[in-house]
């Protein structure tokens, strides 16, 4: 894996609040090597370690994007949802930002069936087919379409399992992480001080509660993905 320079600035990370962890009572002892201090009852993340692992993650996604690999970004907590959708659209990645449906990856055949249903309903709606149904049936299908859009809208163009999954909140997205581990899909996780760094292929110690922190990390990863995709398109 080629090492590159990603302009990861410690002052910018501090400005984004990347270094703020959880309260000292809510921590995972496995995270100890990533903690530099305690301040006013909270743990402070070692930003030098954050920069190192974020740089490694950027190298990984750059190389993967350069080889045409597919990415899935997962972050369903309220503070992450908008940033996840925005970053994913910019980098043309699949994403889940509302709710992780159990078995979304491990039971891919069921997910594929739901996606096909979603596409069929969208096509019918575009053609105006739903307008010709009895009012009760049309209302039922529109509700079903709205629900599918909410939960599957970010993966509507996904035709198979992703090559790499980026998880914004390891603690909240534990089910998604376990599915990736079961399937052997490489993961990159933002880990706060209540997380286990040993569960992911690359763990980036960072504040997963602040929008500014989440956005900082995602922006770096998205930039690396976009650079990799550009390199892929230029290759003969």
Swiss-Prot record:
Family: Belongs to the universal ribosomal protein uS2 family.
Molecular function as annotated in GO: structural constituent of ribosome
Subcellular location: Plastid
NCBIfam families tied to this protein: rpsB_bact (TIGR01011)
CDD domains, per the entry: RPS2 (cd01425)
Protein encoded by which gene: rps2
HAMAP family: Ribosomal_uS2_B
Protein name: Small ribosomal subunit protein uS2c
Statement: the UniProt record of this protein carries the keyword Ribonucleoprotein: yes
GO CC terms in record: mitochondrial small ribosomal subunit; plastid
